């Protein structure tokens, strides 16, 4: 069964107690495919043309599109999360459920919370930590609301007040370093350390056994390394302590981490962060400076099946010309999802380099994020958590609804040429035309979605509407349906 929204076209005549329907299914035979940029090929004797107007306002809850809601299982997490998110006030004066607009619950948390002891995992019944209880609660509530899960598992403790790598990894002899966040001294492992890699591999494979399920999980963000799990400012033992050249170590770790996730997750889409300093040990320099090996390395991850995410949309210059140009190179080859960069409750967002944000006006930031997302043709946008979510709904609800109407992918059959009558033991010709009115695309060219969604015509029982016969047109690919184009297929 496909979880892509079904579209039904009823023919004007019925044959033998069945009627014709058109749908997208999870995996037939096509004669010709052509572009309808030329004169439509609809003059078929005995056929009738059905033209369809799209419903732009319906929230479809389709896979790998729509808004993403964030949550935390760590200490300090909200105890009123669902009551708050089920009663969100909007700038229109209404009160809505966030989950009505979002089909993904994203948990970005510490490896230590998901794996508190060697061989003990937070999703298991035997684990009774507070983080485990929160995780199980979120999983249960997400399922009630028809939301899929998504994850990032962070190992780096910098900029945190707790250790994000489990204590047993350090106790086993993994090499690492201490940093100070406020009054807290925290420890992070070097990702080129073999003891760290041994335990992280064990954890990721355990995750794959439990969560490599596309019916339950929307995506996994790999690799969890660097600051915030975004592959920023990565420090290596070989470089920091032994003084070796960074690139060979950096590339070796990158290859190891991306291959690890790709081996553990074969059915759920994987994401890799893109920014100009992937895996390097340095921080931001300026808008015109970038690492020359970054684009090549990200390309290696994409070849392994990764799609793309960036976590500073609307935050300039960190989402700058390099990032924009990089995203453009991957339009419709791999889907892109976004996360905003500015935290409007604590950051001085009005200092943004583009000079378009006013102090005291978080809606300016929301508008900047929206414009960057539209330009990048993203499939998914983020509500994030707390004040970010509140300002999306309370200050910029019009943009929340616009993304539902315009963002991601919205597929529909714009015209279908159908036979008015059919006889048994004869052949008929159908012509169908498809449009996408979203700025993203349906990523059936991701390896995890290979042959997952196909167009099919079916004959249904008029009394029960059960499928009696199904005919799959294997030529159309939904990833080819791009905003502004209409595709024609003869079947």
Specify the residue positions occupied by each region the protein language model found.
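Bacterial Sec-dependent N-terminal signal peptides
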Residues: 20-48
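Aromatic-lined substrate-binding rim segments of carbohydrate-active enzymes
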Residues: 94-179, 250-269
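Aromatic- and acidic-residue-enriched segments that line the glycan-binding/catalytic groove
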Residues: 158-182, 232-244, 286-292
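Catalytic-core regions of glycoside hydrolase
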Residues: 44-91, 143, 221-229, 234-387
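Catalytic cores of secreted or luminal carbohydrate-active enzymes
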Residues: 365-419
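An active-site-proximal structural segment forming one wall of the substrate-binding cleft
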Residues: 131-143, 172-221, 253-260
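Short amphipathic, basic-aromatic surface patches that mediate peripheral association
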Residues: 434-448
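A beta-strand/beta-hairpin structural motif
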Residues: 468-491
């Amino acid at each position: 069964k496909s979880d892509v929204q079904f579209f039904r076209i009823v023919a004007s005549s019925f044959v033998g107690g069945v009627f014709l329907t058109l749908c997208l299914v999870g995996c037939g035979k096509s004669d010709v495919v052509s572009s309808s940029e030329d004169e439509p090929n609809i003059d078929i004797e005995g056929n009738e043309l059905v033209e369809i107007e799209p419903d732009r306002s319906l929230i479809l809850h389709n896979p790998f599109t729509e808004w993403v809601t964030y949550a935390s299982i760590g200490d300090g997490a909200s105890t009123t999360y669902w009551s708050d998110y089920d009663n969100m006030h909007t700038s229109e004066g209404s009160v809505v459920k966030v989950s009505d607009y979002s089909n993904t619950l994203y948990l970005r948390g510490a490896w230590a919370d998901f794996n508190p002891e060697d061989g003990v995992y937070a999703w298991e019944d035997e684990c009774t930590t507070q983080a485990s209880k929160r995780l199980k609660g979120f999983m249960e509530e997400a399922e009630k609301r028809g939301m899929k899960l998504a994850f990032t598992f962070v190992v780096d403790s910098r900029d945190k007040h707790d250790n994000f790598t489990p204590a047993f990894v350090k106790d086993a002899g993994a090499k690492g370093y201490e940093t100070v966040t406020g009054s807290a001294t925290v420890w992070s492992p070097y990702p080129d350390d073999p003891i760290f890699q041994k335990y992280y591999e064990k954890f990721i494979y355990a995750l794959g056994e439990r969560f490599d399920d596309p019916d339950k999980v929307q995506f996994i963000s790999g690799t969890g390394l660097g600051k915030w799990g975004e592959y920023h400012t990565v420090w290596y033992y070989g470089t920091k302590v032994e003084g070796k050249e960074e690139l060979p170590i950096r590339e070796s770790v990158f290859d190891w981490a991306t291959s690890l996730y790709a081996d553990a997750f074969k059915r759920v889409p994987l994401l890799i962060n893109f920014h100009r300093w992937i895996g390097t040990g340095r921080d931001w320099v300026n808008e015109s400076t970038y690492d020359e090996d970054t684009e090549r390395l990200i390309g290696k991850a994409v070849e392994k099946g990764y799609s793309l995410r960036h976590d500073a949309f609307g935050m300039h210059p960190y989402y700058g010309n390099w990032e924009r140009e990089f995203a453009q190179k991957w339009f419709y080859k791999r889907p892109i999802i976004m996360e905003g960069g500015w935290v409007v409750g604590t950051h001085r967002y009005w200092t943004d380099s583009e000079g378009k944000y006013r102090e005291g006006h978080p809606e300016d930031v929301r508008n900047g994020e929206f414009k960057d997302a539209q330009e990048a043709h993203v499939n998914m946008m983020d509500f994030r958590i707390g004040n970010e979510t509140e300002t999306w709904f309370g200050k910029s609800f019009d943009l929340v609804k616009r993304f539902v109407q315009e963002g991601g992918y919205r597929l529909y059959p714009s015209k279908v040429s159908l036979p008015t009558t059919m006889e048994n033991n004869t052949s008929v010709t159908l012509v169908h035309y498809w449009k996408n009115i979203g700025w993203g695309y349906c990523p059936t060219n991701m390896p995890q979605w290979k042959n997952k969604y196909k167009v099919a015509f079916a004959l249904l029982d008029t009394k029960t509407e059960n499928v009696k016969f199904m005919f799959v047109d294997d030529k159309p690919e939904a990833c080819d349906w791009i905003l502004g184009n209409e595709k024609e297929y003869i079947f």
